[in-house]
Amino acid sequence: MVQCGFNTLVPALVFKLRIFALYPLGNLSTGGYWSNGNGIGVLTSVPGYSPVVNATSIHMDDFNVIHSGGPYTLDANGLVETDDGQVIGVHSHGLLANTPGVKAIMANRTDASPTRWGEIDTFTTWTFQASGKYSELTTATFVANIQLLPSDAEDTVSYINYRLSQVLPGPTCDDADGRGNEL
């Protein structure tokens, strides 16, 4: 099995958001329907991950495009404030599979059920802007798995949870020409 030269993933952060507003913006000339969602929530590190993060969102915006035959395109930006007063910029971009379960949650259907972790086969990439003891987040890249949960209150559109893993270099290849193990 080829292993050298491939990245590894380290569980790092969990971001739990409550989407409280979804604003329709209209059809795009390139296809799809554009909307903006606003959310609030918490960003925390998993046990053993450094830096330790315990933050609450100040503001989160997600400009998303819904394609009838394809996945949703997500593009979220926002700010979180840590429990020690540091502000961290957050950016996420990626896809959300347009499955029947996702459609039911997005349409706020009463029979909608939460998606299971691993059920959605698309992911998002995450980057951060931070300083001080959180500055190492700025030089890292993260990928996230997504879980959606339906609304349970009038002031909630849906819930979206992300499990972020930091992308790290995999083992180096030891052969002289740098190709590593043959595929």
Where would I find each of the regions flagged by the language model?
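Beta-strand-enriched cores of mature, soluble protein domains
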Residues: 2-183
